[in-house]
Amino acid sequence: MLLDTLLELAGGINNVTRILAPQGQVVLALKHPPLVPHLPDDVSLQSVLGEWQLSVQRTAEVSDQQLAAIGKAIAERQKLETLPYQTALDCPYRPLWHISPPQGLLNDPNGFIYHQGEYHLFYQWHPFACEHKDKYWVHLKSLDLVDWQWQSVALTPSDWFDSHGVFSGHAVSHQQDLWLFYTGNTRLGVDRQRQTMQCAARMNANGEFEKLGPVIRCLPEGVTEHIRDPKVIYTQGKWQMLLGAQTLAHQGRLAVYHSDDLLHWHFDKLYGDELGDYGYMWECPDWFELQGEAFFVFGPQGIASANPHHTIEHQNRIFRATQNAQGEIALLQGWPLDEGFDFYAPQTAQTADGRRVLCGWMGLPDETQHPSCDQGWIHQLTALRELEWREGRIYQHPLRELDTLQSEPHTLLLSDNVTELKTKSFALQVTLPWGCELRLMQNTQYRVTLTLDAENQLLRLDRSATQIRQGDTIRELKLDSPTVELRILADQSSLEIFINQGEHVMTSRIFTPRDASGISLHGASVDAKLYYMAPASAPFNLEVNVQP
């Protein structure tokens, strides 16, 4: 049967929500059941989990180009459907200089890269609700890594190979072209069988991204359908694709492919056996070099913490690694990148002057119940960080360009008298003795506390007295320094705490009312430097809609 005939039976392209292509079939998911009284014998109609699906066997008459044409038509409509959700709603929790979504749910940063004199950054977006469903990619650009401008909804879940989500991936700047690599996610049948493919897209002269379709269609041996988040690098005279993977034994591993042309990929092997049972899945791989050392970043899922306050299975890790002349990878020594509540799926980019800069998702996969959901949006990205390899460990520092948003420093005496900052967007530098407690974002009812437990040499971050609705409330970090040097970045509903010159970082969402802008220190009296933070340009397509 011709696709035109199937579309006519479906009631036209405007009645088609998805196109699927499972096992020699073509399936059109419909908004409404077709009005045709009798369907041909070779066409079936069924309701699958509340979605009407019209199916026919795929014949030689149906080409990939025809399927792509339907995908483009669906994408055009999907982009129009996001327009009402591109207006950012005013909210007391919305950051002034971090990237947040106008509405809906933001998660992983994607495609972070410097290309042709500009920085590009994408993020995962579900525009229509604060839930993880049918992911899109939003495209932002910047000249300075501080002010980001909305460009477009770059990719939508419109094609048979990504019908249930354009999952995470990275970008490649090759010659004059900007390529995107991502995981296409589809769900098939009443049991929602997952089908995973690695896909590519390329930016055209108009700044739009044209999908090239799947570049890896089949799973490597020994791996489940949980294989995703391609990172593509050029090394040893060839392209390599790194993928987070799950083995049939439900162990996380790194899958590696190679290619000569970015389009045809060949599987090499799985890496990571030296870590043993190190989580049931590895997500969001990144790979880079820093001061002559190679590093592998990933998100291992299913690692239990020895601390009873840490109950979240979604972890973050960076490992020092090596790759020999034959391309064999070994993972050596690893650490958490962030030890706060809300940090996942980081990506890095190299700046024009050679720095390695990181951006992460200030959220976690299971969190969908933040107070900002009452205003129709959830999650944000972290502040950008510069990475440094020094004295055998990774140090992280706030991006130096963020200094352009800072006011002149104000000396602030921290004591048990509450000082009203009258803002929740600031930077604070202070060195604290053991045995004291710093309270931030406080009023008479709410606060977040940083306790320096002298007896146990623990830095304890406690957000139990905030408006948090979901997630852990205490994080503890063992330190051995005689004092604790802090550099704190606050932005309305977030804290990023850089400890002892960036040796550790704790990133957290902190929800307190708009008037909770007090700060105090109990158990000591110390001078601090306070900087007020100015807003960055709003990373939205449409102006913020201020609610009365």
From Swiss-Prot:
- A biological process term (GO) from this entry: sucrose metabolic process
Q: In which pathway does it act?
A: Glycan biosynthesis; sucrose metabolism
Keyword Manganese in the entry? The reply is: no
State any GO CC term. cytoplasm
Q: Which GO terms describe its molecular function?
A: beta-fructofuranosidase activity
UniProt-listed InterPro entries: ConA-like_dom_sf, GH32_Enzymes, Glyco_hydro_32, Glyco_hydro_32_AS, Glyco_hydro_32_C, Glyco_hydro_32_N, Glyco_hydro_beta-prop_sf, Suc6P_hydrolase
Catalytic activity of the protein: Hydrolysis of terminal non-reducing beta-D-fructofuranoside residues in beta-D-fructofuranosides
Q: Which PROSITE patterns match?
A: GLYCOSYL_HYDROL_F32
Known EC number: 3.2.1.26
Q: Which domain of life is it from?
A: Bacteria
What are the positions of the active site?
108
- The main location class comes to cytoplasm
Q: Where in the cell is it found?
A: Cytoplasm
Main enzyme class: hydrolase
Please tell me where substrate binds in this chain.
Answer: 105-108, 124, 167-168, 228-229, 283
Which controlled-vocabulary keywords does the entry list? Cytoplasm, Glycosidase, Hydrolase
Pfam families xref list: Glyco_hydro_32C, Glyco_hydro_32N
Q: In UniProt terms, what function does this protein have? A: Enables the bacterium to metabolize sucrose as a sole carbon source.
User: Which family does the entry's similarity section mention?
Assistant: Belongs to the glycosyl hydrolase 32 family.
How is this protein named in the record?
A: Probable sucrose-6-phosphate hydrolase
